[in-house]
Structures are given as C-alpha cells and as structure tokens.
C-alpha cells in the first residue's frame, strides 16, 4: 500500500525556518477557533493524526488559502481551521454532502443502526443516482447515513456506479440531526468536484495533497483512481512549486 502525501507551502514561507517562539501563541489563537474539529464522516485513510505536525508550517501561512485537491473527510482542514479554503474531491457525492451542509442541512430521513434500514437506504440512494438526482438534499442525507452505518467508512462503487459498501455491524452509532456548527465553519470555504489538474492555484496557496490509496479495493468513484492518476498528481505539483 502506498500512501502518497505531498505538501506545498507558499514560496517565501517555505524558505523560512519555523519561528517556534511564536508557535505557542499562534496555536493558542487557533485553538480558540477550533471548537469544531471532528470530521462529520468516517473516512478511510483520514489524516487527523497529522494535524499537530502540520500546524508549525500552517501557522506561518494561516492568512493564506488552504487548498486540498483531495479533501476526503476534511480531517486536516477541520484540524487547521483556515479562514479561506478551496476543497476539492473527485467524489461528487462527498462534495454534494458538504455543499448541503454549507446551505444549512438538517436531517429529514430516519437514521437507525439497523441492517434492513441500511439496505433500504442504500437502494434508495442508488435509485437517486440512476435517476440523475445525486445532487439533491435527500442524496446528501442518504450519503451521510450510509457513510456512518456502512463498513469501516468505505466509499466504494461498482462499475455501474452503484454504491456497494456492506453493512457495518457497529454496536452503537451517533447520527447528527443538524449540522449548524459545521455550516458556520464552512461559510468561507469553497467546495468543488473536478479533476485536480483543473484547479487554479495561487503562489501563496498552502497545498495539502493526499490522493486516494493506490490499492485494488478503492473503487473510490465509478471511474476509479489509477496509478497513472498518481503520476499526474506528482507532475501537477511539480508544475506548481
């Protein structure tokens, strides 16, 4: 298994040594804004554990824009809590959920940790996808439920584009009924779903790139994410030093 992590800091910031004398003060100021740090979704390969290691770098650049070409479960972005962010992912269902949270999403479906309900909601979600209604509020809520209830936080689709993650068999699961705290956090963040190579980067952007794993089981989208895509990521970042 390869875990490809690439980090690009603003040019002038990357040339400086970290000012560790100011780090404590910066982290204190940041902590006051960090009342929401826990991701809404379970996400395989989340990098929440890296946030303490990234903070010394981020504290030098926190007035710039944070860019994640593969934002996933938002563990890093929620941990760093930038004022401005460009958050992209090739998974349209993920971005649809975040976009609805930003609008003020509230639960309008029944959510229980029951096998029968899981498969019923999974069938309904796939029916919405087939009907071209993957952008709807209902699809966003179903995606959230399936993520919380499905196996190990996986997001997997078959070749026809159907969500096929099995039931998770957890003892207990907590579900959110509303997402208002996250809405406030998301206000100044831009969410997009496009190929990473089409993102317009600025010289002052702080870029954190964590592409999908290069392993066979990750049919992360209908079209997947191949080794050639991994190479494209590296080449794209080289073009934006």
Regions of interest found by a model, annotated:
Residues 61, 80-82, 186, 239-240:
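Short, well-ordered coil/turn elements that cap or connect secondary structure elements
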């Amino acid at each position: 298994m390869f875990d490809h992590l690439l980090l690009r800091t603003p040019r002038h910031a990357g040339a400086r040594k970290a000012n560790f004398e100011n780090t404590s003060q910066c982290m204190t100021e940041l902590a006051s804004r960090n009342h929401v740090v826990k991701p809404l979704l379970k996400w395989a390969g989340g990098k929440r554990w890296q946030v303490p290691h990234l903070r010394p770098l981020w504290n030098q650049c926190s007035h710039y824009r944070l860019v994640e070409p593969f934002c996933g479960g938002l563990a890093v972005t929620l941990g760093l809590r930038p004022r401005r962010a460009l958050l992209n992912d090739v998974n349209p269902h993920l971005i649809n959920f975040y976009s609805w949270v930003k609008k003020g999403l509230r639960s309008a479906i029944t959510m229980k940790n029951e096998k029968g309900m899981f498969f019923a909601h999974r069938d309904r979600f796939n029916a919405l996808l087939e009907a071209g209604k993957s952008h709807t509020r209902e699809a966003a809520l179903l995606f959230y439920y399936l993520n919380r209830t499905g196996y190990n936080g996986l997001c997997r689709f078959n070749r026809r584009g159907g969500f096929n993650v099995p039931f998770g068999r957890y003892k207990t699961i907590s579900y959110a009924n509303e997402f208002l705290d996250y809405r406030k956090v998301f206000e100044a963040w831009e969410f997009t779903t496009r190929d990473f190579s089409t993102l317009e980067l600025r010289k002052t952007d702080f870029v954190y790139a964590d592409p999908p794993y290069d392993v066979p089981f990750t049919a992360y989208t209908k079209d997947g994410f191949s080794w050639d895509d991994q190479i494209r990521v590296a080449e794209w970042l080289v073009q934006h030093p």
